[in-house]
Amino acid sequence: MTREESIAFYKEHARWLFNISLRIVREPALAEEIMQDTILKALRQTHGPEGNRKLPERAWLAKTCIRASIDALRRIKRERLFLDEYASDGAPEYFSPADSDIPEERLSVNKIKAAIESLSDPYRLILNLILIEGLDYEEISSITGEREGTLRTQYSRARKMLAARLMAGQEGL
């Protein structure tokens, strides 16, 4: 693969992979790192012993990016548990949620995003993968290792939680 082909591949997939990862990890720097690692992994596959391998399909790229993002979340969770357990009171707070809620008088995309972001990990993840990425239960099951029935239950609960949060926000207007 030539340098120009590699650059074209990067330009074609970078933003899409970044957005997938950002919706999961909610930290731009980490999402960018995951996106770059995913692209490097894809490009390395084309430079194997045969030298003329095809580039991976979008489904493979999405699956690889999602798995890397979930792994990063697990790593952050372990670090957070460690900090909570062993850090002193004077330690800096590394994991503060971003305050991105913009007050508006009607139900808006920003309010929906904020409501989704306020959900805990399994519910936020399932909503992002189904509603935003357009994946089905079978694809999500192969990515996360969860059973499809579990995913359906999580999705149903996530929708109810999201609706309740949006309704609570509407009543406050």
What are these regions (language model features)?
Residues 29, 138, 149:
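Residues within helix-turn-helix
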Residues 79-105, 136:
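Internal acidic/polar
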Residues 66, 70, 123, 143-168:
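DNA-recognition helix of helix-turn-helix
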Residues 126-130:
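A short pre-motif secondary-structure segment
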Residues 19, 33-40, 44, 55-67:
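Structural recognition of an alpha-helix C-terminal capping motif at a helix-to-coil junction
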Residues 62-84, 105, 157:
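Arg/Lys-rich amphipathic alpha helix in sigma70-family domain 2
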Residues 1-19, 29-32, 43:
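A short, charge-rich alpha-helical start-of-domain segment used by transcription regulators
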